[in-house]
Amino acid sequence: MLEMGRRVMVAGTFDIIHEGHIKMLWSAKSLAGDDGELVVVVARDENVRKYKKREPILEESIRAYIVKNLKPVDRVVLGERDPIESVLKLRPDVIALGYDQWADENWLREELLKRGLNVEIVRLPRFGDSSSSSIVRRVIKLFCSSE
């Protein structure tokens, strides 16, 4: 654990950064406290293919670079093949899950306890109406539809 604050971990694809991502990151940062740390795990390209069943729009190094340069973010790491491995390496005090992330809080808590980690798990609400997929649909509608 950090000296005064807490280490909060957030994980995601962060393919097209939008308002909801920024608000979610600020919310997660507030859980860390003044001297805490927000660590963002950016999904590997192979995990985007595996879990989202699609190609990433931007490659992992670009997504990590963009997230690293967002104000609330203290540190960025690329994820592991097994998402639990990232948690074991980072040893966060808190995992902040997005409203739409696949992980069930109880299952995740139990899996981590089996491995000796007692981590607080928080499910964050949806922030705004933006989503990466809605942005993609809008771009297709505006620029790819034949009229």
UniProtKB/Swiss-Prot annotation:
Keywords associated with the record: ATP-binding, FAD, Flavoprotein, FMN, Nucleotide-binding, Nucleotidyltransferase, Transferase
Entries under Pfam families matching the protein: CTP_transf_like
Associated pathway: Cofactor biosynthesis; FAD biosynthesis; FAD from FMN: step 1/1
Domain of life: Archaea
Coiled coil location: none
Cofactor(s) needed: a divalent metal cation
The name this protein goes by in its record: FAD synthase
